[in-house]
Swiss-Prot record:
Residues 215-297 are annotated as: Sushi-like. The gene is Apoh. This is Beta-2-glycoprotein 1. GO terms for cellular component: cell surface; chylomicron; extracellular space; high-density lipoprotein particle; very-low-density lipoprotein particle. Residues 1-19 form the signal peptide. It comes from Rattus norvegicus.
Length: 297
């Protein structure tokens, strides 16, 4: 018995015999497999196949952001039909995201109704005095849910201590919280080492705790030095002392080459070390040339 999946084709070619009678050739029939109709293009997806002949199977897959609504494969039947019916690719959506405690929506735009599409994002922000732990942006995933939500926690910082030889100002309230600021300053002749303004961070600590550093009294009475690229008289520029962190370059003599060079000195919290090569010029030794007036090496 011949399968109904095979189609008969007759090749009725009549041949003329020598005796004048007509005869049918022996090989006149051919069977070929049934062919199912073209599966078409799967919108937002792909169809994987080799042929559409019985009993082949075709497969389906959707592009990122879409899911198969229906079967993942279909078979060509003896009747020349696909079974099960061909699927469609439906768009993945996420419901409105839950809002974390002590948080609010910063950026949120739905794609259809109240739902969001795959890879749509939502941005959260924390209420005042609450710090965010985790990513502020969540994304609609291929599974139809949102990536991990952030957490908003209340953060408090201790009252900042007043630095020695300085002062600090901060908001007059019982508790200092996340993002609150404090401003530091120093008394005269002292310089702030660190930022003037600091902030309460999410760790419960201040971003910095600056201190006040003392100025330096110079043992040198008169000298020409380099300060910030300019030649200055040390007795004029630093008559009240050098501030912490200030740098100057003293002129020194190279006796062998009869030329001058410079050595750096820096004031560090009330202390400055004068270069050993420096010799303070005496007005009594008027015949001697000051190192600052000697040709550079």
């Amino acid at each position: 018995m011949i399968s109904p999946a095979l189609i008969f084709f007759s090749a009725f070619l009549c041949h003329v015999a020598i005796a004048g009678r007509r005869m049918w050739p022996i090989n006149t029939l051919k069977c070929t497999p049934r062919v199912c109709p073209f599966a078409g293009i799967l919108e937002n997806g792909v169809v994987r196949y080799t042929t559409f002949e019985y009993p082949n199977t075709i497969g389906f897959a959707c592009n990122p952001g879409y899911y198969l609504n229906g079967t993942s494969s279909s078979k060509c039947t003896e009747e020349g039909k696909w079974s099960p019916e061909l699927p469609v690719c439906a768009r993945i959506t996420c419901p409105p995201p839950p809002i974390p405690k002590f948080a609010a929506l910063k950026e949120y735009k739905t794609s259809v109704g109240n739902s969001s599409f795959y890879q749509d994002t939502v941005v959260f922000k924390c209420l005042p005095h609450f710090a965010m732990f985790g990513n502020d942006t969540v994304t609609c995933t291929a599974h139809g849910n949102w990536t991990q939500l952030p957490e908003c926690r209340e953060v408090k910082c201790p009252f900042p201590s007043r630095p020695d030889n300085g002062f600090v100002n901060y908001p007059a309230k019982p508790v200092l919280s996340y993002k609150d600021k404090a401003v530091f300053g120093c008394h005269e002749t002292y310089k702030l080492d660190g930022p003037e303004e600091v902030e309460c961070t999410k760790t419960g600590n201040w971003s910095a705790l600056p201190s006040c550093k003392a100025s330096c009294k110079l043992s040198v009475k008169k000298a020409t030095v380099l300060y910030q690229g300019q030649r200055v008289k040390i007795q004029d520029q630093f008559k009240n002392g050098m501030m912490h962190g200030d740098k100057v370059h003293f002129y020194c003599k190279n006796k062998e080459k009869k030329c001058s060079y410079t050595e750096e000195a820096q004031c560090i919290d009330g202390t400055i070390e004068i270069p050993k090569c420096f010799k303070e010029h005496s007005s009594l030794a008027f015949w001697k040339t000051d190192a600052s007036d000697v040709t550079p090496c």
